[in-house]
Amino acid sequence: MKQFLLWLFLALVLVSCARVGSPIGGGKDTIPPKMVGSNIDTTRINVPRDLKELRIDFDEYITLKDINKNLIISPPIKYTKIIPSSMGNKYLQIQWKDTLQANTTYNFNFGNSVVDLNESNPLPYFNFAFSTGDKIDDLFISGTISDALGNEKNSEGKDRNLVIGLYQVKDTMNYRQKPYYITKADPDGYFELNYLTPGKYKIIGFDDENNNSIYDLGKESVAFQKQEINLESSISGMKLKIFPSKKAIKYKEMAISTGGVLMTFEGNPDKVIVKAVGDKPSDYKVTHKLRSDSVKIWFDAGKENIGVAVSENLKFSYDTGTKQDTVSIFYKKPAKEDMTVSNPFSNELAPGSDFRFASNYIITKIQPENWKLESDSISQNFTAKISELDSTQVIVKSNFVVGKKYKLTVPKNTVISFYNRLSESVRFDFEAAKPEEFGSFTVNLVNKPEHNFWIQLLNDKSEPVYQKFSNESLIKFINLKPASYKLRILVDNNDNGFWDSSDFATETLSEDVYLYKKAGDKDIMTKINIRPMWEINENWDLTKEEQSVN
């Protein structure tokens, strides 16, 4: 028994000694792993085409961090196995089944995925290249890629995964395959495409949200150039701008909504014609804002006895101009469909502004003669109208005095929807803010655009908070809430009343965009800090290359 315990103790000691652990004592290791060899000759040329694996040796134990996201092989090879997968090792190994192309330089870009086992020190931007020919191609393209609209995150609020690729120019371009050469931009947007062979290429950059190394048309933001690149010598300083992708118009779904059903589309159609198919509903109204993704079909389910006891199959036809179809929904009337009015805006009125309130239904009639506006218990004259831009909103105008508090009483049944649905009584309390609580901003545009443009003040999420549609050189924003803003101009080059983004499918570039950025500013856009009672004046020269996108 004692002999057995002795052997067990020795075995445990040997296992413990064989483990890879952190060194005891001394300073923290900050040195990344170092490559010491590979299974390919040091010249890395004339590599056999039937080679099926790459092995790279290092001077210390390593592990691979997010290797499936970081590893990019150009031209693409479909690999089958990567070592180490999780445990540490002193080498990495990639295996594949493909036969290598003749006279081709292959580049394995590992990004920052190779890290030492103990401290996770990355071997930065590690590349390994070899050639099946008698030389390694050494041309490169380097540059930066950035968001044309100044957005630092993607549409879902996540960090971008920016990929840049080159396609060989052919009679038929297939962008549904991986690019022939591909790389990823670093967090600052800098990229390098290395070990390139001379030839003609089309370049593309995109936010690879699903990590498939292929641009998904209509789903991912994209940057491209219309002209081909005739690569005879290396190119540096290329600038790519990434734009929201134009989506093809496509029906998505129909859902039950307060007062009817809501039909949604991809691609923001200009116009959608919707008609009921069948007897129900017989009385309905369709609302759709130009280039909105939503179409609301309003009807009185209770009045027409639609889906009251059991669900009913309702059918509607739609016509977007490019597609027509008939769709259906099993409709069950919601238990509660009351019409409500509320103030989703602000209880504080900026100087010179009107009071607004909104309803969850479209409004067809109001009876303001029955309403009451008071300040300090004294009635005050006012006018009210349904908004021409949004029929769910009401605008109330009066001589609002700064610093005073107001009370607007809207009795029951004085806000009416198109099929006689009536609102409940409601009271709004609000205050006319003082001018000294706000600031102002004036910008003088040097070499302004020839066409009309939207000039916008954006919040930290790059959402427009204030904007003007103009063609003037001197633009003034007054009564701005104190905050940090960014300044952007969108140009209506085609004079259609909308700003149009790039369309990769037709190789149509976006309309012009200008981002306000002072020389030397490290941020994408210069911040404008608005303070109470402060007036800021700036000159903005739109001819500077750093500010113009196209």
Annotate each PLM feature.
Residues 13-16:
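C-terminal motif of bacterial Sec signal peptides marking the signal peptidase cleavage site
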Residues 2-10:
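Sec-dependent signal peptide recognition
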Residues 225-233, 509-518:
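Short, composition-biased linear "edge" segments at structural boundaries
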Residues 523-550:
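Gram-negative outer-membrane assembly/targeting C-terminal domains
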